Amino acid sequence: MKLYHGSNVPVNVPDLKHSKPYKDFGRGFYLSADRKQAVGMGEQKLSQIKQGSVYVSTFLFDESVMTSGELKVKIFDDYSEEWVNFIIANRSYDRKQPVHDYDIVYGPIADDGVTYQLRRYEGGVISLERLLTELRYPKGITFQYFFGTERALKCLKRI
């Protein structure tokens, strides 16, 4: 399958040293199966950095790796209490990072709207049930792939 990475620079060889901590699934290389979503991520990066251009780098990924047992993989098929706790742990500046040892994680993106809702939940403003209800918006869920180890990155082939 093709996976896409949006940024303000082209990425020919992904490496973890350019990855920032405290992201949804931790420090890693993030991709999407949706090219349009990757373009949006590139636009977002460009607006933050204010230099470069929008680039979408394309990679081939043999998705059988997700179930082969070769790598440690975590899959979140939907928003759930486990997903909420995983995102909160990875984004927490108060916890020792990394908080997990997965090679690859697949699951919903916590975009800006989700981040706001997570803060409300953490602050006790809304319950977990209310949070999960609010996360299910009409546009549907957007998913991301996280590659967090060198072993995982070796599964990506730039095209």
Where in this protein do the model-derived segments appear?
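Short linear sequence elements within intrinsically disordered, low-complexity coil regions
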Residues: 9, 30, 35, 64-66, ...
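Ordered hydrophobic segments in well-structured contexts
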Residues: 1-5, 29-30, 56-58, 144-146
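Glycine-rich loop/turn
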Residues: 1-29, 36-47, 82
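Conserved NAD+-utilizing ADP-ribose enzyme module
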Residues: 23-24, 40, 44-159
